[in-house]
Amino acid sequence: MKTRYFLLLGICMLSCRTDEKKQVQKEVDKPNVLFIAVDDLNNMISPIANFSNIQTPNFDRLAAMGVTFTDAHCPAPLCGPSRSAIMTGLRPSTTGIYGMTPDNKIRRDDNEATKDIIFLPEYFKKNGYHSMGIGKLFHNYAPDGMFDEGGGRVKGFGPFPEKRFVWDGFGTSKSRKGQYGRTNTDWGAFPESDTLMPDHQAVNWVLERFNKNYKQPFFLALGFQRPHVPLYVPQKWFDLYPLESIQTPPYQSDDLNDIPPVGLKINDLPMMPSTEWAINSGEWKKIIQAYLACVSFVDYELGRVLDALKNSPYAKNTIIVLWSDHGYRLGEKGTFAKHALWESATKAPLFFAGPNLPKGKKIDAPVEMLSIYPTLLELSGLQAYARNEAKSLVRMMQKNEGLKDTYAITTYGKNNHAVKVDGYRYIQYEDGTEEFYDNASDPNEWINEANNFKFKSKIEALKALLPKTNATWDAESNYTFQPYFVEQKTRGNVNAAKAVKVIGAER
């Protein structure tokens, strides 16, 4: 009897261990996620626009590994609200997060939209993933406790020389006593070595993670700070781009003559260099040279990451997503900044690579960066999160589904929106004034066709896609270095906007 009892007990224990082993194996078999954010990266890279013969071989390499979206658009053309939207899966018009919001203040009890939201990295953590992150991921780094292993972020966008090279950071705001702050914008060769750059140090940290063994699948996030201003990288990256070889983007000095007043107010950026200033001072090509140099530096660091992943045990079972928070204008529409609802400010690179995805595929249909959250969940075999406001792109990548009816929405402040569909862009401002562009015939968006009867039905169709919700500015969200948004928040909220002394001081 006892023998029979112990035999049954042994069988039960063996069965339990087998089930436990199967469960562990099931967890390990889930794909890992390598999540890469690049700050202020526009579509000039070689696998998309290949502007001015830019040298970005590792972006080409990533494109060959998976799917490149050539017409992806940001939730907002500003770091803070764009990243908050991507990490929550919620539109700025839903949350009221239109400006810069401290990472720990995004999810709060007094914001009905975000009070119980699950951030993207958290969703993986809650589903058995080991979460890790370093660099600029949210507006600063990340909310407290976001990662099992966190590398943090070097504050600011340094290192900095003792004295700025060209731009004082105030621009015309000096005449307003600097009341709208000071930008980090400047350009020049600095420091002497890549090893002094925070992005290089962050990649070193990531490479250490690839050398470890994990019992769980991992979610590993890396946030690059360049090519965000200041446009400082070592001289060797500038040497790739002799000034005589630099192209400048198309520009018309009277381009803004048909823009509604709200659009002009939004484009009033007193601290930033204007295109006219850049032309007259001879600095235009130098600014572009510095931007291209910064992008090539990031490309090199990306190559280090791809090499390390390739040589790791995780090479065949890791999903890669690389994205930027918005585009960046290099003289288009009169300035050097993101900060607008036009194509050059909202469009940015988006790549996916990994198991069960085609290689070397390009998709030219407009899509949203907001789709990153649901797309990663589906690729990882995780249950969809009902709070996500955008659609997964998996079927589009795998089967070309949804190419004809896809669109992208960008929001900039309360009730200012752009809608991009294939070949057209519609912009509506809070006062109902409009812009409409036929991108097929007018890729530079120089001719506002909003009053052209020829496009009436198309305009109405795009207008129907605008968000139906336009939340009041979140109390903790501020954008006080731009005159129009200071006025908009103060006008629409009881509490006035809080002062910000320096652009990027909290980044």
Swiss-Prot record:
**Modified how:** The conversion to 3-oxoalanine (also known as C-formylglycine, FGly), of a serine or cysteine residue in prokaryotes and of a cysteine residue in eukaryotes, is critical for catalytic activity. This post-translational modification is severely defective in multiple sulfatase deficiency (MSD).
Q: Which of the residues bear the PTM 3-oxoalanine (Cys)?
A: 79
The UniProt entry's sequence similarity note says: Belongs to the sulfatase family.
Q: What is this protein called?
A: Sulfatase
Q: Which domain of life is it from?
A: Bacteria
Q: Which UniProt keywords apply?
A: Calcium, Hydrolase, Metal-binding, Periplasm, Signal
Tell where it localizes. Periplasm
**Cofactor descriptive note:** Binds 1 Ca(2+) ion per subunit.
Report the active site residues: 79, 139
Q: What class of enzyme is it?
A: hydrolase
Q: Which Gene3D superfamilies match?
A: Alkaline Phosphatase, subunit A
Positions of Ca(2+) binding: 39-40, 79, 325-326
The Enzyme Commission number assigned here is: 3.1.6.-
> Per its database record, what is this protein's job?
Sulfatase that may be involved in ulvan degradation. Ulvan is the main polysaccharide component of the Ulvales (green seaweed) cell wall. It is composed of disaccharide building blocks comprising 3-sulfated rhamnose (Rha3S) linked to D-glucuronic acid (GlcA), L-iduronic acid (IduA), or D-xylose (Xyl). Has no activity on different ulvan polymers.
State the signal peptide span.
1-18
Question: What is the source species?
Answer: Formosa agariphila (strain DSM 15362 / KCTC 12365 / LMG 23005 / KMM 3901 / M-2Alg 35-1)
Q: Please give the cofactor(s) recorded in the UniProt entry for this protein.
A: Ca(2+)
Q: Which GO terms describe its molecular function?
A: iduronate-2-sulfatase activity; metal ion binding
Q: Which GO terms describe its cellular component?
A: cytoplasm; periplasmic space
SUPFAM superfamilies given for it?
Alkaline phosphatase-like
- Its chief place of residence is periplasm
Q: By its UniProt entry, which InterPro entries does this protein fall under?
A: Alkaline_phosphatase_core_sf, IDS, Sulfatase_CS, Sulfatase_N
